[in-house]
Amino acid sequence: MKSTILSVVLAIASIAVFAQKKTTTSATIAFDATTSIDALPKAENKTVVAALDTKTGSIQFEAAIKSFAFSNPRIQQHFNAANWMDSDNFPKATFNGTITNLAKVNFSKEGTYTADVEGALTIHGVEQKIKTTAAITVKGGVINATSEFSIKLEDYKVNGAQVTSGKVSKEPKITVTSEFK
């Protein structure tokens, strides 16, 4: 009898812990590096792995560089080349961060919340600290998060000829969207 009660208590506790950690393999990261010279440098990766711990505010993203899709295959080839993203040597971009105003985000109550996020963004093997905001919407037990920010390519040692020629923005806009169920 005691072992049955203990098993039930442990099962309930593990469900509660599991419910605090949300994951997805279909988050999206899009970037727009268009300039007045070239409107083509836009890409999207719809297979980003993301995790959110609603108890601690910990949030992580991992994106395979080769999974960014461009409208023009030639641009995708340049993007992955050694003189640009060098995706053979740096196959992933990652973000490890925290919601710093977690007390203002109620994951158990429907609504839209503004989250302050800080963390480390690693691209091209270079880690930089970033701060941004995210819009978090809770509805029907689903958590949707969206964030938009810019990065400086030179901060990540991305200096392809397209950047110096003005064909690619030196500060592309990054948009991250994720749905945690």
Question: Which stretches of residues belong to each language-model region?
Answer:
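Low-complexity, acidic/polar, glycine-enriched regions of mature
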Residues: Q20-K181
